[in-house]
């Protein structure tokens, strides 16, 4: 089983990538325009925005700045996205306790 912290397609990394893509699209910034605004290569930017690679804080700052949005806002949105996808923890024994009452 893959470690969620090291797998770029899961967890917060994937949610951050999704939020960066959503922000780019909301602002109608083309991928090529974004690449021109930052120092990252086209291939690296593609991998980061598609959660194929773990995003560094430096890359996150650069991409967010190029889109005119704060890193905090992107991370908060990503956390909300994760919260929607994460089911609440299951409580064990509750059904059994109610049946005995």
Where would I find each of the regions flagged by the language model?
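A short, Lys/Arg-rich alpha-helix, primarily the initiator
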Residues: 1-28
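Short, charged recognition helix plus adjacent turn
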Residues: 2-4, 75-101
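Residues within the helices of the helix-turn-helix
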Residues: 21, 32, 61
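The alpha-helix within a helix-turn-helix
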Residues: 24, 35, 64
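Recognition helix of helix-turn-helix/homeodomain-like DNA-binding domains
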Residues: 39-54
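Short, basic-rich loop-to-helix N-cap that marks the start of a DNA-contacting helix
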Residues: 52-65
């Amino acid at each position: 089983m893959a470690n969620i912290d090291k797998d770029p397609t899961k967890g917060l990394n994937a949610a951050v990538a999704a939020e960066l893509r959503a922000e780019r699209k909301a602002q109608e910034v083309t991928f090529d325009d974004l690449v021109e605004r930052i120092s990252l290569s086209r291939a690296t930017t593609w991998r980061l925005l598609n959660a194929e690679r773990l995003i560094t804080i430096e890359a996150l700052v650069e991409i967010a700045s190029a889109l005119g949005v704060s890193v905090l806002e992107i991370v908060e949105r990503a956390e909300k996205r994760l919260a929607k996808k994460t089911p609440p923890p299951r409580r064990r024994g509750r059904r059994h306790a109610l049946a005995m009452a």
